[in-house]
Regions:
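Single, function-defining residue in the core of a domain
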Residues: 1-105, 113-120, 125-364
Length: 364
């Protein structure tokens, strides 16, 4: 057995194949895909017979995507148990995977407001509070039956039940994370601005789940003022240097940024349009405002359930949010290295399965 073969086995815990030949074939396929990322199944496997064997494997109902995900998640839990970390960050994000106008993909719908075919891939990965990626906790894919409807007003969109909105996947991912992770492991869910909705905050409180979210909504807080104004006008609590990861999309290299931060306890309230009884009327949270020193540049407004008692604890939370860029890097590698958008599979379910498979490779 090669070292590579053994290592890939460690990424799938208790994967259940009744036929050991299928298990052997599975790891050979993983090994081939990892050695030739972005190539077609035919090119990666190296021969006509190997390619046919791979196609037969993907057509076999022996192992489902859900079973594969459970196995991957269990492997991540094993790594988490060995990690030296105060918190494990459960970092969520969504990326769009487009297939252009390839209408021949069975079951594939739309992913944006145009006629372009594609799917949305929502992932949750485990990262230590020191920024070390550990593995995939959860992943789901969705494709729209129709192109996104941009004709609705903001108020129409806001009034829809959360279960009918696409950002429901952020709630779903948090629930799945808590189900999959051992209860004695401290989890901090980290989200970008798409996770900024009251239903998420309220359910996290019900589940006693900690979160750290960059907010975009300038909410009213307990003293009748807007949260952004309150944070900007509050005294500077301290300064710190934040390591910003490189942004390959905008060709920005990694760099250190000196930032000031402000911190304030706030109370936010259930939106008036939300009448659901299960939503909490108000929530007491910690708000943090971080911005570049002396100039207009990078700034973050953060909300968290974590109570802070010192500057050191504030700085730790800011660094934890900075680690959110690990998932953007992960999605970038999945799409640019794995070239999943160029995969020639002709069925949505298979592309979803392959995306999860390539996600494990991308994490490495």
């Amino acid at each position: 057995m090669t070292a590579e073969y053994k290592n890939w086995q460690e990424e799938f815990v208790d994967i259940n194949f009744t036929d050991q030949r299928l298990k052997s074939r599975f790891f050979k396929i993983i090994d081939a895909f990892a050695a030739s990322p972005g190539k077609s199944t035919w090119a990666a496997t190296g021969s006509r017979s190997s390619a046919k064997a791979a196609y037969r494997f993907f057509s076999n109902s022996e192992i489902s995507k859900d079973e594969l995900l459970d196995s991957i998640s269990r492997a991540t839990v094993e790594k988490i148990k060995c990690a030296d970390a105060e918190w494990i960050l459960a970092v969520q994000d969504t990326t769009a995977v487009g297939f252009g106008d390839r209408k021949a993909i069975q079951g594939m719908g739309y992913y944006c407001s145009t006629e372009q075919r594609g799917m949305l891939v929502h992932s949750c990965i485990a990262v230590t509070d020191q920024g070390i990626p550990l593995g995939i906790i959860y992943q789901e894919t969705n494709t729209r039956e129709k192109p996104r409807d941009d004709s609705q007003t903001k108020e129409q969109k806001r009034s829809r039940p959360i279960e009918e909105k696409e950002n429901f996947r952020w709630l779903d991912s948090m629930r799945e994370t808590l189900l999959r992770m051992p209860a004695d492991i401290p989890i901090l869910t980290v989200c970008d601005r798409e996770g900024d909705f009251y239903e998420f905050f309220s359910e996290a409180a019900d589940l006693k789940a900690d979160f750290l979210i960059r907010i975009v909504q300038n909410r009213m807080v307990d003293d009748g003022k807007k949260i952004f104004h309150e944070l900007r006008s509050s005294p500077v609590a301290g300064s710190m240097v934040v390591r910003m990861s490189r942004n390959p999309k905008e060709h920005i290299p990694s760099r250190n940024i000196k930032m000031d931060y402000h911190c304030k306890k706030v109370t936010i309230y259930r939106p008036q349009r939300r009448k659901e009884k299960h939503l909490r009327e108000k929530l007491e949270l910690t708000a943090i405002y971080v911005h570049e020193c002396g100039k207009k540049g990078t700034e973050w407004f953060l909300l968290t359930t974590v109570t802070v008692k010192s500057e050191k604890e504030i700085e730790k939370l800011v660094q934890c949010y900075a680690h959110r860029w690990k998932i953007e890097r992960f999605h970038f590698i999945l799409k640019s290295g794995g070239k999943i958008e160029k995969n020639q599979a002709r069925e949505y379910g298979r592309l979803s399965f392959l995306t999860l498979l390539y996600s494990v490779i991308a994490m490495q």
